[in-house]
Regions:
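Active-site core of metal-dependent hydrolases
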Residues: 93, 190-281, 296, 336-338, ...
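C-terminal cap of metal-dependent C-N hydrolases
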Residues: 5-11, 17, 336, 348-392
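Metal-coordinating catalytic core of metallo-dependent amide/deamination hydrolases
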Residues: 131-232, 236, 270, 302
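Active-site gating loops and adjacent loop-to-helix segments of metal-dependent hydrolytic enzymes
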Residues: 70-97, 138, 151-155, 160-161, ...
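Alpha-helical scaffold segments that flank or form the walls of functional sites
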Residues: 74-125, 169-196
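Histidine-rich, glycine-flanked metal-binding segment
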Residues: 9-56
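His/Asp/Glu-enriched, well-ordered alpha-helical/loop segment
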Residues: 71-72, 78-84, 88-89, 216, ...
């Protein structure tokens, strides 16, 4: 049992508590409310007095490569792109994530409790993302959802990767055609399997969760025309999809709104070091959100460092995103987009006890994470300011 008392609780459900408490038992939130309704806790061993500091859901990174692209390890620590063939749906991020990567500690120090992690964008089909918690030593024990999405990529990255090898795709036409062919073949396989007309095929089995609507396509798209191509193909096959990066999304807001697909915007803190990201700007998230599009914000770690995710949200707020939407973009919105909002993203009874305590607004640069909790377990405390949090 863990009890947090005297917290300024922001639940992300619309119901907040100026002086509230939370109880977590066996990893799940069991009670939340005003301090006036708090059960006796004096004889409990695990009590955190938040002393009026902000208590909110653990922050969520909606798209990154932590543990797959490690820091300062060169080729040995880079397992992000199997860039020798363009279609690799059978690759699983879970088989490449190293929980010992320094990014996991950085995430905990920033109040980030979970992340969507997967392959890079060198391939037309890159493989399967996994949604994980950010604390642990065995990746199998950190999994929330696997597979969680199927990575596809449009534009500059697959073009540059394969055009120099004298193999397709060398053009945007080929990228779209190859993806269509793969989906066509996977759909045909699904129908044959349903009628017991073929043997199992490992490659096409990987597509069944996508074709059955259990997980979305996760589309790497920057340029407006690439965003529209992704939408076109997903609609042709009746698939769900997230628009990741969406750097020129603000130029085609109506079309994205009509598609019904959510946007994962970023990494806007990165440099415009590619041709297709010349219109990348922090204003994109606000413009899309104001149009009624569900928005999450990403660092695309290690493109931007994962610990700067709350600051990226703050810069989006500075550029027009509503303040409450800034917090939603790193909590409940990514949870919904990633299909895990039944477990994380808000503070509600029955959900995982993933909680972050801050000494201010996490979107402000001087704010510190005082305590990070995953499934009721304290996984980080800021010792330099431990006097602000009593652990009795």
């Amino acid at each position: 049992m863990l009890t947090i008392i005297h917290g300024k609780i922001k639940t992300m459900t619309g119901v907040d508590y100026e002086d509230g408490f939370i109880r977590v038992d066996k990893g799940k939130i069991t009670t939340i409310g005003n301090m006036s309704d708090c059960p006796a806790y004096e004889n409990e061993n695990n009590v955190i007095n938040a002393q009026g500091n902000l208590v909110m859901p653990g922050i969520i990174e909606a798209h990154c490569h932590m543990g797959i692209t490690e820091e300062k390890k060169g080729m040995e620590g880079d397992d992000c792109n199997e860039n020798v063939e363009p279609i690799t749906p059978y690759l699983r991020a879970v088989d490449a994530i190293n929980p010992m990567d320094a990014a996991f500690d950085d995430a905990l120090r920033a109040g980030i409790t979970s992340a969507m992690v997967g392959p890079g964008s060198s391939n037309v089909v890159g493989g399967q993302f996994v949604f994980i918690k950010t604390h642990g030593r065995c990746i199998d024990n950190m999994i929330v959802k696997a597979p969680a999405a199927m990575k596809i990529a449009f534009g500059e990255n697959p073009k540059v990767n394969f055009s120099g090898k004298d193999v397709s795709p060398a053009t945007r036409m080929a990228i779209a055609a190859m993806l269509r062919q793969e989906l066509f073949d996977a759909k045909a396989y699904k129908n044959k399997r349903k009628n017991n007309q073929c043997e199992m095929d490992f490659r096409y089995e990987c597509w069944l969760p996508v074709l059955e609507g259990k997980i979305p396509l996760k589309a790497h798209v920057h340029r407006a025309d690439d965003i529209l191509t992704a939408i076109r193909i997903a609609k042709e096959y009746g698939l769900s999809m997230t628009l990741d990066h969406c750097s020129e999304g603000h130029l085609i807001t109506d079309e994205i709104k009509e598609s019904g697909f959510p946007a994962i915007v970023g990494p806007d803190m990165a440099s415009r070091n590619k041709i297709e990201v010349q219109n990348m700007a922090f204003k994109t998230a606000g413009i899309l959100s104001q149009a009624g599009i569900r928005v999450a914000i990403t660092t695309d770690h290690p493109v931007s460092m994962i610990q700067f995710l709350p600051i990226c949200a703050g810069l989006a707020v500075k550029s027009g995103l509503a303040a409450d939407e800034g917090l939603r973009a790193i909590t409940i919105n990514p949870a919904i987009i990633c299909g895990v909002d039944d477990r994380v993203g808000s503070l509600e009874v029955g959900k995982d006890g993933d909680i972050a305590i801050f000494d201010g607004n996490p979107m402000e640069v001087f704010t510190k994470a005082l305590c990070t909790i995953i499934e009721g377990k304290i996984v980080y405390t800021d010792e330099s300011i431990c006097d602000k949090i009593d652990k009795d």
